[in-house]
């Protein structure tokens, strides 16, 4: 018989949300860094 799930605590929700935000921030930082290095010509990455 189905039973309602327990509610996720606010602190746990905030921790998960912050972790998710941090991953996005790091990805964006990496992308901007790569774009900057390509524009300045100091890139060591081969762009096709």
UniProtKB/Swiss-Prot annotation:
It is found in: Plastid, Chloroplast. The keyword Ribosomal protein applies. GO terms for biological process: translation. Keywords: Chloroplast, Plastid, Ribonucleoprotein, Ribosomal protein. Pfam families: Ribosomal_L32p. Its main location: plastid. One of its GO terms (cellular component) is large ribosomal subunit. GO terms for molecular function: structural constituent of ribosome. Belongs to the bacterial ribosomal protein bL32 family. This is Large ribosomal subunit protein bL32c. It comes from Vicia faba. The lineage of its organism: Eukaryota, Viridiplantae, Streptophyta, Embryophyta, Tracheophyta.
């Amino acid at each position: 018989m189905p039973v309602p799930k327990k509610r996720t605590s606010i602190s746990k929700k905030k921790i998960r949300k912050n972790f998710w935000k941090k991953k996005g921030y790091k990805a964006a930082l990496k992308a901007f860094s790569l774009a900057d290095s390509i524009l300045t010509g100091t890139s060591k990455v081969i762009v096709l």
